[in-house]
């Protein structure tokens, strides 16, 4: 019997989730975890509404995993330490997560991979070191999947977009059928029996995280997977007018899905598939905006200096 740990990050949903699908398909028992990253939270204002948005999304993930027969372990601290320690404690054979492309996230993931290797090798010297598997999930094409004919990264959007569209096939828009293997989720009873005092299996409050309580009504966006779904369905009714209305705030012409895409409560594959399936200028313009996300992540990967500097400084 093999087991794995899925680390939720900027992918706060239980459907069409690459890492969760691959873990469930490959292992008999799959644990799930979310870490409230203290290295990030400690730098934020105590009234930062992003934390409330994330908290609501985590609550929904926990509820959905419970409905599917699983559970969500909640931790707070530095994931560079928390994830390897949890993997060693659970005795899993692998940790699964979806890839992040920001420089700080790349450094974090490299440290997590090294600490997993070091800790698990020390705790289980007779076994192969645990693996840390990362999957593409928040973009359609990543890193080096769309390049110039010379094999170099694009630096101008329109040629990148044209190459992106040329490469696109239905294969890249296929959803991951997580529920097909949901029986492999490790449930609450398993965790409470094995670790009755050590693991938090409930979502903390904002106050417990050190933040000011926020009335859900004060959040300007509906939250979580259900909120993202609602916004998407509402936007499909306005899609035909997107190209003309998006630049006018009073027209309510945008999708309002930016935060949901940022934290993964919606699936980029689902959105791109819908946009690609529709005709008209509105759908084409929205698809172009979704392609821009891939372009930006590709630029961030190849040119990490853009985090703090101009991409092409004026000479």
Can you name each region flagged by the protein language model?
Residues 152-314:
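Glycine/tryptophan-enriched, flexible segments
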